């Protein structure tokens, strides 16, 4: 049985855009570069040829990777699922660090979509695991490498 990878609608759209670009722009450009490099003669010492072949290998590998992810993904539209006012996959959560009054806003996404610098956290991260299923005004304790941290849930958005 295949384990489906949870992915937001935005995450799937981003992968589809990348796949389209790789297939319609990058792949033809690389093929043209290989053909041009072949015209220069001896392929053994042709750096342009080897560089283009390496780029082709990377491009084709990424195409296969994206196609596999999309075929094994469960695309979840957070706006269309019941949440009962609780934190769920795909929701955007504003939390307050009770100790230092620092506020954070995170969106809970799939592993491949996560980007901490953009406040996109993986469903499998300690913060997300601690928040899932909780409601506004709940206090959660998140185990971090620096010790346990208490957060209060201020706001939950489903966008």
Swiss-Prot record:
<dbReference type="GO" id="GO:0006354">
    <property type="term" value="P:DNA-templated transcription elongation"/>
</dbReference>
<dbReference type="InterPro" id="IPR001437">
    <property type="entry name" value="Tscrpt_elong_fac_GreA/B_C"/>
</dbReference>
<dbReference type="InterPro" id="IPR036953">
    <property type="entry name" value="GreA/GreB_C_sf"/>
</dbReference>
<keyword id="KW-0805">Transcription regulation</keyword>
<dbReference type="InterPro" id="IPR028624">
    <property type="entry name" value="Tscrpt_elong_fac_GreA/B"/>
</dbReference>
<dbReference type="InterPro" id="IPR018151">
    <property type="entry name" value="TF_GreA/GreB_CS"/>
</dbReference>
<dbReference type="GO" id="GO:0070063">
    <property type="term" value="F:RNA polymerase binding"/>
</dbReference>
<dbReference type="Pfam" id="PF03449">
    <property type="entry name" value="GreA_GreB_N"/>
</dbReference>
<comment type="function">
    <text>Necessary for efficient RNA polymerase transcription elongation past template-encoded arresting sites. The arresting sites in DNA have the property of trapping a certain fraction of elongating RNA polymerases that pass through, resulting in locked ternary complexes. Cleavage of the nascent transcript by cleavage factors such as GreA or GreB allows the resumption of elongation from the new 3'terminus. GreA releases sequences of 2 to 3 nucleotides.</text>
</comment>
<keyword id="KW-0804">Transcription</keyword>
<dbReference type="GO" id="GO:0003677">
    <property type="term" value="F:DNA binding"/>
</dbReference>
<dbReference type="GO" id="GO:0032784">
    <property type="term" value="P:regulation of DNA-templated transcription elongation"/>
</dbReference>
<keyword id="KW-0238">DNA-binding</keyword>
<dbReference type="InterPro" id="IPR023459">
    <property type="entry name" value="Tscrpt_elong_fac_GreA/B_fam"/>
</dbReference>
<dbReference type="InterPro" id="IPR006359">
    <property type="entry name" value="Tscrpt_elong_fac_GreA"/>
</dbReference>
<comment type="similarity">
    <text>Belongs to the GreA/GreB family.</text>
</comment>
<dbReference type="InterPro" id="IPR022691">
    <property type="entry name" value="Tscrpt_elong_fac_GreA/B_N"/>
</dbReference>
<dbReference type="Pfam" id="PF01272">
    <property type="entry name" value="GreA_GreB"/>
</dbReference>
<dbReference type="InterPro" id="IPR036805">
    <property type="entry name" value="Tscrpt_elong_fac_GreA/B_N_sf"/>
</dbReference>
<protein>
    <recommendedName>
        <fullName>Transcription elongation factor GreA</fullName>
    </recommendedName>
</protein>
């Amino acid at each position: 049985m295949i384990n489906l990878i949870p992915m937001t609608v935005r995450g799937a759209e981003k992968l589809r855009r990348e796949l389209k670009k790789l297939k319609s722009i990058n792949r033809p450009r690389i093929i043209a570069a290989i053909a041009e490099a072949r015209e220069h003669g001896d392929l053994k010492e042709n750096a342009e040829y080897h560089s283009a072949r390496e780029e082709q290998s990377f491009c084709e590998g990424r195409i296969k990777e994206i196609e596999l992810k999309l075929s094994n993904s469960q695309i979840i539209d957070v706006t269309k699922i019941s949440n009962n006012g609780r934190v769920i996959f795909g929701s955007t959560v504003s939390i307050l660090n009770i100790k230092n009054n620092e506020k954070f806003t995170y969106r809970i996404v799939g592993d491949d979509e996560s980007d901490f610098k953009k406040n996109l956290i993986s469903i499998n991260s300690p913060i997300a695991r601690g928040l899932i299923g909780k409601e506004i005004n709940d206090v959660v304790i998140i185990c971090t490498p620096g010790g346990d941290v208490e957060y209060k849930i201020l706001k939950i958005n489903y966008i």
